[in-house]
UniProtKB/Swiss-Prot annotation:
Transmembrane segments: none annotated. It comes from Rattus norvegicus (Rat). The gene is Cyp7b1. GO terms for molecular function: 25-hydroxycholesterol 7-alpha-hydroxylase activity; heme binding; iron ion binding; oxysterol 7-alpha-hydroxylase activity. GO terms for cellular component: endoplasmic reticulum membrane. It is found in: Endoplasmic reticulum membrane; Microsome membrane. Its cofactor is heme. This is 25-hydroxycholesterol 7-alpha-hydroxylase. One of its GO terms (biological process) is B cell chemotaxis.
Length: 414
């Protein structure tokens, strides 16, 4: 379980780059990356716009989008409404993420456009495990159709019509024009890759966050208390409209909320860290030695740590406060008597670490805060939900079925 440290120490001999480029070519029809190092480097530089001050700007936009979506629709629902958790999460996460990153659609039928794009995206995502397999795309007719349909919605001409596009999308548009000129479809393929990366794991992760919180009312209560204490300490009042505001630092200060999100990711993330061997080599770890040939793949599987009872007591259980100790973030976990440097690894490591991880976690935190602050939530189905392992090694697992819950906006008259 600790051998990922040895894999990370050999970045030149064990490379993520070629594997990543082939995956982009197959899944998103991004072909030029296979042969163009400068393009790859420019794309990676663009990911800096998902950190620091640029991330603060994205969070501001996201808060505005959340406010508009909830106030125009969900906050008006003062009677109990029933919904399916996965449907509810996919609808919310898709619209908030899309409008935060790509901007607002100005067309009169924007609701219909967003709804259709979401349905198309979910169909495309259902095919994703097949797209990254060795099956030729020509045999995956539906997947290829959905891929092309979404790309045509994300061409530079279409994206330029969006209002309030994020910095990363604007910069990406300009940078891609440098390489592709007027090849609209090729640039749209890159946008599909960005859209998929921003949604494919956040949607199921948000499902699991809601699922576990609905199953554990005691966790909801503690998180509500933490959020209420924060709002009081910053002089913010809850009322009929969404007036609460958070900076990135303030979101990070909510230790119970962060712990609950990390615990969700620990339980449902089954991503792997994959590297391609660049030259014949001997690879030694603490426990054994291996002879690796050029072209072999090495995979490290973080769930071995996430589910190790020596690292996490009762690893199958959801414990929302697992990452809290004495009111602060708990960061000390041990294996074989040694303190682990990395004990929760849902986003990969090294060069393959997800550049949008802060964006995704902030989005989940914000949605949990709004749902717990402004709504009463109750589970209807109490049946346990399992993981659907069709995305093994590819990230957050989808549930094997959906469950119903009910919700209503809280009354503020009192």
């Amino acid at each position: 379980a600790l051998e990922y440290q040895y894999v990370m120490k050999n970045p030149k001999q064990l490379s993520f780059e070629k594997f990543s480029r082939r995956l982009s070519a197959k899944a998103f029809s991004v072909k030029k990356l296979l042969t163009n190092d400068d393009l790859s480097n420019d794309i990676h530089r663009g990911y800096l716009l998902l950190q620091g001050k640029s991330l603060d700007g994205l969070l501001e936009t996201m808060i505005q989008e959340v406010k508009e979506i909830f106030e125009s629709r969900l906050l008006k629902l003062t009677d109990w409404n029933t919904a399916r958790v996965f449907d509810f999460c996919s609808s919310l996460v898709f619209e908030i993420t899309f409008t935060t990153i790509y901007g607002k659609i100005l067309a009169a039928n924007k609701k219909q456009i967003i709804s259709e794009l979401r349905d198309d995206f979910l169909k495309f995502d259902d095919h994703f495990p097949y797209l990254v397999s060795d099956i030729p795309i020509q045999l995956l007719r539906n997947a290829e159709f959905m891929q092309k349909k979404i790309i045509k919605c994300l061409t530079p001409e279409k994206v330029a019509q969006m209002q309030r596009r994020s910095e990363i999308v604007q910069e990406r548009q300009e940078m891609l024009k440098k390489y592709y000129g007027h090849e609209e479809f090729e640039i749209g393929a890159h946008h599909l890759g960005l859209l998929w990366a921003s949604l494919a794991n956040t949607i199921p992760a948000m499902f699991w966050a809601m699922y576990y919180l609905l199953q554990h009312p005691e966790a909801m209560e503690v998180l509500r208390d933490e959020i209420d204490s924060f709002l009081q300490s910053t002089g913010q009042k809850k009322g009929p409209g969404i007036s609460v505001h958070f900076t990135r630092e303030q979101l990070d200060s909510l230790v119970c909320l962060e712990s609950a999100i990390l615990e969700v990711l620990r339980l449902c993330s089954y991503s792997s860290i994959i590297r391609e061997v660049q030259e014949d080599m001997d690879f030694s770890s603490e426990s054994r030695s291996y002879r690796l040939r050029k072209g072999d793949f090495v995979a490290v599987f973080p769930p071995m740590i996430h589910n190790d009872p020596e690292v996490f007591d009762a690893p199958k259980d959801f414990r929302f406060d697992r990452f809290v100790e004495d009111g602060k973030k708990k960061t000390t976990f041990f294996k074989g008597g040694k303190k682990l440097k990395s004990y929760i690894i849902p986003f990969g490591l090294g060069t393959s670490k997800c550049p949008g991880r802060y964006f995704a976690i902030n989005e989940m935190k914000l949605l949990v805060i709004i749902l717990l602050t402004y709504f009463d939530l109750e589970v209807i189905d109490t049946k346990p939900i399992g993981l659907n392992h069709s995305r093994m090694f590819l990230g957050i697992q989808h549930p094997d079925s959906d469950i119903s819950f009910r919700y209503k906006a809280k009354s503020w008259r009192s």
